[in-house]
Amino acid sequence: MNNKIKLIKEDITQLEVDAIVNAANSSLLGGGGVDGAIHRAGGPEILEECYKIREKQGECKVGEAVITTAGRLNAKFIIHTVGPIWSGGNKNEDELLSNAYKNSLLLAKNHSLKTIAFPNISTGIYHFPKERAAKIAIQSVTKFLKQDNQIQTVFFVCFDFENLEIYNKLLQTYK
């Protein structure tokens, strides 16, 4: 199981994987952090597809996910998911964050993708506690991989050493 999960500290926009997960906001129109970086690096095609999705379904709800082209990125697709804003833990944030991971993995499966890279969803400007978010991420992905053999590799792409250390410590308990 654990050989399917890889932990790295890199620029997620540079990865050659089937899908990069974007920690998007509900507008799908780009923003700060990883969301802005993906839109800038991927180019206007990503935004164009996001506009089309909005025309069809409206905004993307928290915990849900949608898929677009990856534009100029080395990945084949971008899976945009909306993580919850941390509000103290009393507004279903844990379940919503878990859903963001599960729904992203389901989209990858439905598109026959084998490799997927996740950023640290909701731990930036959404202020989700990093250790709590990492635990939810690892549990959600591990549970999904136990039930599905199609996805071969899941990358957790940490944007700082603090997240890298947290994930590394937690992944030791899943060996």
UniProtKB/Swiss-Prot annotation:
One matching Pfam family: Macro
InterPro entries registered for this protein in UniProt: Macro_dom, Macro_dom-like
CDD domains from the UniProt entry: Macro_OAADPr_deacetylase
Highest taxon listed in the record's lineage: Bacteria
Macro domain span: 1-175
Record-stated family: Belongs to the MacroD-type family.
Protein's recorded name: Macro domain-containing protein LIC_13295
Organism (species): Leptospira interrogans serogroup Icterohaemorrhagiae serovar copenhageni (strain Fiocruz L1-130)
